[in-house]
Amino acid sequence: MILTSESVTEGHPDKLCDQISDAILDGVICKDKNARAGIETIAGNGVVHVFGEVSNPDSVDIPGIIRKTILDIGYTSEDAGIDGNTCSIQESITSQSKEIADAVNFSLEYRNQQGDLGRNSFSQQGSGDQGSVFGYACRETPEMMPLPITIAHKLAYSLAFVRKEKILPYLLPDGKSQVTLGYDSANRPKTLETVVISAQHEDSVDLDKLRFDILERVVRPVISATGLDCSKATFLINPAGRFVTGGPSADSGLTGRKIVVDTYGCAAKHGGGALSGKDPSKLDRFASYMARWVAKHVVAADFAESIEVQISYAIGKAHPVAFNIDTHGTNTIALDKLKRAILKVFDFRPAAVIDSLDLKRPIYQKTAAYGHFGRDIFTWERICPDKLNALLGAV
């Protein structure tokens, strides 16, 4: 089996927009932890346009947040792709639809007086939308992430690191990585097949020097730590040639266009919904994190070598309408028994998930580059001993 996954640097136009959307979201949550927000950003040709819905749009300095985010990434001149100091900023922010707000605030169960419906009951809040999400975990890395996306993220992060630390001072913010691995008959990663790096750079640098520097300073340090067989690997660094014009001046950026980069690469399914710019009442956010949290606990309990968790919701309903798991034949107990144990131990109602993972905090800008999963700074990446013991006991 061959598996390929890609990542992008924080300066990629789409990732720039993800970070702007989530930086604004963090600012909104700082003012009101119960705020609702769905923030989209588009960037191109020296213009940044934010639009969407926010329950308290006047509470934050949106232009100030946008400029700071752009400058922190490293876009300080139009020559690099956009200048955070001088770019044009446009806002089209409205409040959330009352119909949607009512559906979230008063669930179908609440309106029909079903179940435990006390004033602070987790059943009172409904899902912010319909849809399905997928969570995944496996034994390929200590982080329980697929190895191809893990390597791709490390390469993209390393590109930004050597730029910001002036190790390769001629690099500019835009960049991408892609990794192809070969798997053995037991579906374990075995060989490094191909690495692709595209790095934006200043006009003055020689292309051969750039290729050598990136191979030695970025690629080899990351790859050498993997233990993969690299004897037949192909390394393609800036295979298109020079990459001087980059960032939003070369390609317009848009929030939510790197959803596979954000999750598990090509190793798992995706429900199609983006995460960035959305407050934790949105199922693309709370349910995606919950599905990952559950998947990690199943693997940590040694009930499967890998698992894909699917959760589906209806707008305005607190309880999921569907739940499924796929262990790709690696389960150590019967699937129906494992599924019952998960549903017994974990509470999938939106308010319960938000409470369990402490999601009403300004944590989201950090998720918007180098993946939402695989970093233990996030609550959904941490194994809860009580949940793990409960899961072990439930089977």
UniProtKB/Swiss-Prot annotation:
Pathway it belongs to?
Amino-acid biosynthesis; S-adenosyl-L-methionine biosynthesis; S-adenosyl-L-methionine from L-methionine: step 1/1
* Task performed by this protein: Catalyzes the formation of S-adenosylmethionine (AdoMet) from methionine and ATP. The overall synthetic reaction is composed of two sequential steps, AdoMet formation and the subsequent tripolyphosphate hydrolysis which occurs prior to release of AdoMet from the enzyme.
State its location(s): Cytoplasm
| Residues that coordinate or bind L-methionine | E53, Q96, D251, K282
Instruction: Print the keywords alphabetically.
Output: ATP-binding, Cytoplasm, Magnesium, Metal-binding, Nucleotide-binding, One-carbon metabolism, Potassium, Transferase
Q: Which reaction(s) does the protein catalyse, per the Swiss-Prot or TrEMBL entry?
A: L-methionine + ATP + H2O = S-adenosyl-L-methionine + phosphate + diphosphate
Under the heading PROSITE patterns, the entry gives: ADOMET_SYNTHASE_1
Pfam family of this protein, just one? S-AdoMet_synt_C
The residues the record assigns to binding ATP are H12, D174, G175, K176, R242, F243, D251, R257, K258, A274, K278
- Cross-referenced HAMAP family: S_AdoMet_synth1 (MF_00086)
Q: Which chain positions lie within coiled-coil regions?
A: none
Q: Quote the record's cofactor note.
A: Binds 2 divalent ions per subunit. Binds 1 potassium ion per subunit.
User: What name has this protein been given in UniProt?
Assistant: S-adenosylmethionine synthase
Q: What PANTHER family would the database entry show? A: S-ADENOSYLMETHIONINE SYNTHETASE
Question: Which metal ions or organic cofactors does this protein require, according to UniProt?
Answer: Mg(2+); K(+)
Q: Which family does it belong to?
A: Belongs to the AdoMet synthase family.
Provide the residue span(s) of the region labelled Flexible loop: 96-106
Which GO biological-process labels does this protein carry?
Answer: one-carbon metabolic process; S-adenosylmethionine biosynthetic process
Tell me a Gene Ontology molecular-function term this record carries: magnesium ion binding
Annotated residues that bind Mg(2+) are located at D14
Please state the Enzyme Commission number of this protein.
2.5.1.6
- Keyword flag Protein biosynthesis: no
One GO cellular component term noted in the UniProt record for this chain: cytoplasm
Q: How does it assemble?
A: Homotetramer; dimer of dimers.
Q: Entry's InterPro entries?
A: ADOMET_SYNTHASE_CS, S-AdoMet_synt_C, S-AdoMet_synt_central, S-AdoMet_synt_N, S-AdoMet_synthetase, S-AdoMet_synthetase_sfam
